[in-house]
From Swiss-Prot:
It comes from Glycine max. This is CASP-like protein 1D1. Belongs to the Casparian strip membrane proteins (CASP) family. Glycans are attached at N52. Its main location: membrane. Homodimer and heterodimers. GO terms for cellular component: plasma membrane. Pfam families: CASP_dom. Residues 52-73, 130-161 are extracellular. It comes from the Eukaryota. Keywords: Cell membrane, Glycoprotein, Membrane, Transmembrane, Transmembrane helix. Residues 1-30, 95-108, 183-193 are cytoplasmic. The lineage of its organism: Eukaryota, Viridiplantae, Streptophyta, Embryophyta, Tracheophyta. It is found in: Cell membrane.
Amino acid sequence: MASTDKHGDTEYRTSSSTPAPAGVDYFKFDVILRFVLFAASLVAVVVIVTGNQTEVILVPQPVPWPAKFRYTPAFVYFVAALSVTGLYSIITTLASLFASNKPALKTKLLPYFILWDALILGIIASATGTAGGVAYLGLKGNSHVVGWNKICHVYDKFCRHVGASIAVALFGSIVTVLLIWLSAYSIHSRVPK
């Protein structure tokens, strides 16, 4: 005894063949933010590297004394970390562009983007913190330790370059937080409710 009710069969077929929600597609914003991260990394590196300054210091006799980023390990780490960030942002921008027309690949890339973006955020934050600490010592000095005097009143150009570079790196870390948030939200929007 077969049922002649076709209405029940069509309801079952339509509900089972409904595709999973596609989620909101933010890959255009992802590509833009990754390009902005590259630009911020590049600008921060160029600004700190070009901030060299030489001043004549009056010790027993006048001596030219240069200030360069490579004389401070914290600034060298800062340049290296932001260079890695720039390279990473180029690679992930290209990956985002490549995956922009492939929905299955987009979904697979999102967890990896979150993981690697979080790692890069840690690198940017640690580099910015170490460079910021040394820059603060250059600006204010430390009267409790002999030899840690202020230098920014003498090396004003160098200190301005360091400060601007740190500010741009902080902006880059905010962009990285936005990238993590965007990827997490994209994954969340793809989960069926």
